[in-house]
Swiss-Prot record:
Lineage: Bacteria, Pseudomonadati, Pseudomonadota, Gammaproteobacteria, Alteromonadales
Gene Ontology terms: biological process: cobalamin biosynthetic process
HAMAP family: CobT (MF_00230)
Domain of life: Bacteria
Transferase among keywords: yes
Keyword Nucleotide-binding set for record: no
Protein name listed in UniProt: Nicotinate-nucleotide--dimethylbenzimidazole phosphoribosyltransferase
């Protein structure tokens, strides 16, 4: 039975109240713009939440909220990893998924610290983890095809992944969540992300490929060669963003893309982590440009292609810490800044409230 095509209806955020929202920000007890990027972030969040509620209240009566923030970590294996494009073998994907489930990874530590709920989704690792609670089964296969030899997956598998992702987001939306963050785990997925980036942005592979988790120069050369072979092999089939995912993507990248689209469809805030998550966002924006309004980019990673993708998406990340771990770690660390932008908007006194002469 074939999987029917999945589409998303994503509304752009309303900018009708921008002048009033900006006035609300500017009248806080500070010089205009003194809170820097937190101010533009507050404006973005206010737009999204005003669009969601379709409220007619004046912005001064609007309270911004972050409710049940949830970190979704999508895991999948990649056929190209068998060619030695990473410092670790594919078996490490499964081992790290177990580590997530047992609470021992960096993402677990950071989620506990900042207040994220964490959910781990098996999108298609080589061997499923049996008998361990806390892993959601959304398997699309046992690892993708090796993209330099064959498509990563069938086009209908992309739609199946999108449908699964939409159901996942709907469950969290029904539970009241209004902010989801995206992380991943998959040995070889920087190769898939770099291939996606090169295909969509029409760049040379060398401008997209980095050292991932820290590969040496010999491995880097092999990685470059294999991605170039993949792009050459699939050149005639890369007719659109879904085809790019089918030919070059990963099961976890597919489901991240679908989940970002589904979250924007439900007018939820979407926090994007690093290089791989940004590649998923890149595809999502190609499918539905309005999704960009809902995306908050957490950080600029140490992966050399990430800055180019961020610039292409006109994104200014909140953090730049030299991270190259993935898992959603940068997105987790950005949550306190997102909450700070909400808190200053809601709680900071205006000049008139405080009896202070306005600073212009």
């Amino acid at each position: 039975m074939s999987q029917s095509a999945v589409s998303f209806q994503i509304s752009p955020v309303s900018k009708a109240q921008d002048p009033l929202i900006q006035q609300q920000i500017d009248l806080k007890t500070k010089p205009p713009g003194a809170l820097g990027q937190l101010e533009s972030l507050a404006l973005q969040i206010a737009r999204v939440q005003a669009t969601d509620s379709q409220q007619t209240d004046q912005p001064q009566n609007t309270v911004l909220k972050i409710v049940h923030p949830t970190m979704l970590v999508f895991a999948g294996d990649h056929g190209i990893a068998a060619e030695g494009v990473s410092i670790a073998p594919s078996e490490v994907t499964r081992q790290m998924v177990q580590n997530f489930a047992h609470g021992g990874a960096a993402i677990n530590v950071f989620c506990r610290q900042v207040g994220f709920r964490l959910e781990v989704i098996d999108c298609g690792i080589l061997t499923p983890v049996e008998g361990v609670e806390g892993i959601i089964d959304q398997r699309l296969g046992a690892g993708t095809g090796a993209i330099h030899l064959e498509p990563a997956m069938a086009l209908e598998t992309v739609d199946k992944g999108f449908a699964m992702a939409r159901d996942l987001i709907e469950r969290h939306h029904q539970a009241g969540c209004n902010l989801v963050a995206f992380g991943e785990m998959g040995i070889g997925n920087t190769s898939a992300a770099a291939a996606i980036m090169a295909a969509i942005m029409q760049l040379d592979v060398i401008d997209c490929v980095g050292r991932g988790t820290g590969i040496n120069s010999e491995t880097l050369e092999r990685k470059l060669m294999l991605i170039e072979l993949a792009l050459l092999l699939h050149q005639s089939a890369l007719s659109g963003p879904k085809s790019v995912l089918a030919c070059l993507g990963g099961f976890e990248i597919v489901q991240m893309t679908g989940a970002m689209l589904a979250a924007a469809e439900r007018k939820m805030l979407v926090v994007v982590d690093g290089f791989i998550a940004t590649a998923a966002a890149l595809v999502a924006v190609q499918i539905a440009p309005n999704v960009r309004d809902y995306l908050i980019f957490a950080h600029q990673s140490d992966e050399q292609g990430h800055l180019r993708m961020l610039e292409f998406l006109q994104a200014k990340p909140l953090l730049s810490l030299g991270l190259r771990l993935g898992e959603g770690t940068g997105a987790a660390l950005a949550l306190p800044l997102i909450q700070a932008s909400v808190n200053f908007y809601n709680q900071m006194a205006s000049f008139s409230d405080a009896g202070i002469e306005a600073v212009v």
